[in-house]
Amino acid sequence: MFDLHKFSLRAQEIIEAGGFLYGAGWSPATSSNYSARIDDANIAITVSGKHKGRLQAQDIMVVDLQGRAVASQMKSSAETLLHTVIYDLKPNVGAVLHTHSVTATVLSRALRPNTEIVFEDYELQKAFRGVYTHEGRCVVPIFDNTQDIEALSALSVEYLKEHSDCPGYLIRGHGMYTWGETMAECLRHVEAMEFLLACELEMMRIKS
């Protein structure tokens, strides 16, 4: 089993994150899914189909790192595996956020057939953990959207094993995944990623 107090704390973090992300326009309607680590074996995650701007305690459930529900009959997102593989691969990660902003959706489509986006010489790259200067490249992969979540999760794991400094990834025409050691850090990464994606989209407009 899991610690109920820790679950309650993580659930509250998820609820507050949902209010912020919905308010920013990055998680419209019932899109997106959020999670936070409870312990080495379990995570708290949003129940499927819930409005992320109006989350309540009963909208958060527990799954193990294989994505199986723990002490619950509720159903988590079909994309739960995309969360659990990150926790399994990165023991230091404490939160994972999947958002559906207009910028991430449009830019990932506009860059087709590119399989990555490169941020370079932006001051805000320093918002990502482990980045201390703008003088460098931050590469974010773009994976094609698919209903085959097992295949997509395997693809993400393969990439992240080879690029341990990667701060997140895009799913083309779908949205973005980011993570952090804490929920606060994860939210910072979302904000930074959204800013940088918006800058890249604006640069494309200027150049066209």
UniProtKB/Swiss-Prot annotation:
SUPFAM superfamilies: AraD/HMP-PK domain-like (SSF53639). SMART domains: Aldolase_II. It catalyses: 5-(methylsulfanyl)-D-ribulose 1-phosphate = 5-methylsulfanyl-2,3-dioxopentyl phosphate + H2O. Binds 1 zinc ion per subunit. Keywords: Amino-acid biosynthesis, Lyase, Metal-binding, Methionine biosynthesis, Zinc. One of its GO terms (biological process) is monosaccharide metabolic process. It is an enzyme of class 4 (lyase). It holds the Pfam family Aldolase_II. One of its GO terms (cellular component) is cytoplasm. Pathway: Amino-acid biosynthesis; L-methionine biosynthesis via salvage pathway; L-methionine from S-methyl-5-thio-alpha-D-ribose 1-phosphate: step 2/6. InterPro entries: Aldolase_II/adducin_N, Aldolase_II/adducin_N_sf, MethylthioRu-1-P_deHdtase_MtnB. The keyword Zinc applies. Its cofactor is Zn(2+). The keyword Lyase applies. It comes from the Bacteria. Its EC number is 4.2.1.109. Zn(2+) binds at residues 98, 100. One of its GO terms (molecular function) is methylthioribulose 1-phosphate dehydratase activity. Catalyzes the dehydration of methylthioribulose-1-phosphate (MTRu-1-P) into 2,3-diketo-5-methylthiopentyl-1-phosphate (DK-MTP-1-P). Belongs to the aldolase class II family. MtnB subfamily. This is Methylthioribulose-1-phosphate dehydratase.
